[in-house]
Amino acid sequence: MKTNILTIIILSCVFSYGSQLAYADENLKDLKRSLRFAYNITPCDYENVEIAFVTTNSIHINTKQKRSECILYVDSIVSLGITDQFIKGDKVDVFGLPYNFSPPYVDNIYGGIVKHSNQGNKSLQFVGILNQDGKETYLPSEVVRIKKKQFTLQEFDLKIRKFLMEKYNIYDSESRYTSGSLFLATKDSKHYEVDLFNKDDKLLSRDSFFKRYKDNKIFNSEEISHFDIYLKTY
């Protein structure tokens, strides 16, 4: 009798553990599908455009282009205090991921705004290292190309994710990757981390994923030392 009870307990534990693994696997697949959909997007990318007006937490920009016979605007939502750095009439560069396309003549983004600087056609390149389960590989210098003296973490993040999606299929439902991080290192030994799997986000939507860019984190290209990407399969 005791043997039968023990067997039942063991089988129950095994079944419960297996169910938890299956549930976690499905959750990861859902997360990957949502990330693939969210980041498979064409960014708002404009140079030398003008700020129409600013509010407490938004920057409204006239792109001088037309969509649906109307002037196309970009409305950037930012954290409190960010708009103090900009005024009406400022010339800016925009690189942001739209989370809302309604109305059709306004693209809504979070952050993604830097003061315009005339960098010409010179592309900046960065040293990068990919670490997969402890195995390091130096990445080609053209993985991330940026033409601005200043850029946002949002732009760098998207270009890294695009590279990883195209080269390593990190967000494919059946891919072996379970987690990953991007570390952007500056010459004063500071590191800025981005969770490439957005595991802190409760809602699997563009709006939720892209809110992380509200702080409009800006880097000067001359400050960058290198970047590291860590991917894990366990």
Swiss-Prot record:
Taxonomic placement: Bacteria, Bacillati, Bacillota, Bacilli, Lactobacillales
The keyword Cell membrane is assigned to this record: no
Gene that this polypeptide is encoded by: speG
Protein origin, superkingdom: Bacteria
Name this polypeptide is given: Exotoxin type G
Pfam families: Stap_Strp_tox_C, Stap_Strp_toxin
Homology family: Belongs to the staphylococcal/streptococcal toxin family.
GO molecular function: toxin activity
PROSITE patterns: STAPH_STREP_TOXIN_2
Keyword Signal included in the entry's annotation: yes
Function: Mitogenic for human peripheral blood lymphocytes.
Keyword entries, A-Z: Signal, Toxin, Virulence
Signal peptide: 1-24
GO cellular component: extracellular region
Misc note: Binds to major histocompatibility complex class II beta chain.
